[in-house]
Amino acid sequence: MKVLAAGVVPLLLVLHWKHGAGSPLPITPVNATCAIRHPCHNNLMNQIRSQLAQLNGSANALFILYYTAQGEPFPNNLDKLCGPNVTDFPPFHANGTEKAKLVELYRIVVYLGTSLGNITRDQKILNPSALSLHSKLNATADILRGLLSNVLCRLCSKYHVGHVDVTYGPDTSGKDVFQKKKLGCQLLGKYKQIIAVLAQAF
């Protein structure tokens, strides 16, 4: 299920994800503007690069932890079950302007954040003893929240962008156990792939 929402208010909801809360509720703000609660840091782009590098450095370990925790048939069928075949994933163009790349990064991080929330919720039910996986998912979500905050600051402070249409990650609540595991694996495969591209692009 895709939910389109616009602007800073849904973003602020995403910035306060609770693990396992699923997709944030869509809210359409009235005349969305750049409302930042705290001053932006001077070295925002360095922080964004650092956070992307941190995510890129841990993405493969998260992917391995995930598919290992799912058990068979996942570890021996990665291409078939965990290929990054996510059709509604937001696009990214590495050769765009900084502003265009930041807008696309914003969309991607919102999508990934809600996806991770759904994956974490599902894994706590499907694999309650996989504590290292839960911890890694939570740590990744924390970095994504910080990254999102920095991207918002940069877009608002430098480019006066207060309105971006976003697509949230797919809701898995109505899917069966195998489909939840498979979609999670595909999303983390896509995450591993795109985060490497993003880390190189900034």
Swiss-Prot record:
Stretches assigned to coiled coil: none
InterPro entries named in the record: 4_helix_cytokine-like_core, Leukemia_IF, Leukemia_IF/oncostatin, Leukemia_IF/oncostatin_CS
SUPFAM superfamilies: 4-helical cytokines (SSF47266)
GO CC, one annotated term: cytosol
GO MF terms held by the record: cytokine activity; growth factor activity; leukemia inhibitory factor receptor binding; signaling receptor binding
Signal peptide: 1-22
Any one GO BP annotation for this protein: response to hypoxia
Keyword vocabulary terms for this entry: Cytokine, Disulfide bond, Glycoprotein, Growth factor, Pharmaceutical, Secreted, Signal
Compartments where found: Secreted
UniProt key word Disulfide bond: yes
Disulfide bonds: C34-C156, C40-C153, C82-C185
Pfam families: LIF_OSM (PF01291)
Gene3D superfamilies registered for this protein in UniProt: 1.20.1250.10
Residues carrying sugar: N31, N56, N85, N95, N118, N138
Family: Belongs to the LIF/OSM family.
PANTHER family reported for this sequence: LEUKEMIA INHIBITORY FACTOR
Protein task: LIF has the capacity to induce terminal differentiation in leukemic cells. Its activities include the induction of hematopoietic differentiation in normal and myeloid leukemia cells, the induction of neuronal cell differentiation, and the stimulation of acute-phase protein synthesis in hepatocytes.
Protein name per UniProt: Leukemia inhibitory factor
Organism of derivation: Homo sapiens
Lineage: Eukaryota, Metazoa, Chordata, Craniata, Vertebrata
Gene name as annotated: LIF
